């Protein structure tokens, strides 16, 4: 018997129709289970408040310029003020020949090869602009058995610079060396001064250099006085001396054989600064 609809009351399906609908739904669920399908989950309730939007991950467009070597360099670990090294007191018959790293690549290679062939290992304090001009210079220094350090980015007179500019000179060269070699270099040396100031020691330590390499003997080769004068200056070196010299000068190249012969005659061995202060 069919039930007639009553005005104002929702229509009700016949019991037989409900049973047929339930059976059909059960059959569909059974087929889904056999096929390994899961019935759709009930929708999750909306959160009470608006959810924060996630920031999209940065992406590099195909036309983006590559990062500069300075930007790619790993950061150094900040430390307290660096210690200034002027000369060693180990008593060993050793001296450190340390070179301002600048000049032309061809002449610099000749100087470094002459030192290596003469059995000398030296420390090259590189100027950052030199490394920028000759990106393979760092590898050349290391491949010849020498040591690399930081001699500021552009060799400005640091005592005339603001603290911020001094920091930039140190850190920019550090980052260039690290990008080329994987490390910041063995030492920092201030530019245009024999000794570091307290501020420069603090900045060097903050840049990750525990030691600043100053010197006790100036070879004067940067004034181009001639090989004889440079050799005469080197004859005043004693055990433990740190000697300041320069790449990029023809007179320095000409003086190398005699310098090494004089050191050998006095029983002094030229080593890297790291070896001297070990």
How should these model regions be labeled?
Residues 1-13, 25-31:
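N-terminal secretory signal peptides
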Residues 71-169, 176:
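Active-site beta->alpha N-cap acidic-glycine motif
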Residues 110, 157-264, 268-269, 274-278:
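Catalytic domains of cell-wall/extracellular-matrix polysaccharide-remodeling enzymes
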Residues 14, 91-92, 118, 144, ...:
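Residue-level preference for short coil/turn positions at secondary-structure junctions
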Residues 15-16, 189:
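Short, cationic motifs built from Arg/Lys/His that form the positively charged side of catalytic pockets
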Residues 46-54, 58, 63, 69, ...:
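C-terminal domain-boundary segment and adjacent tail
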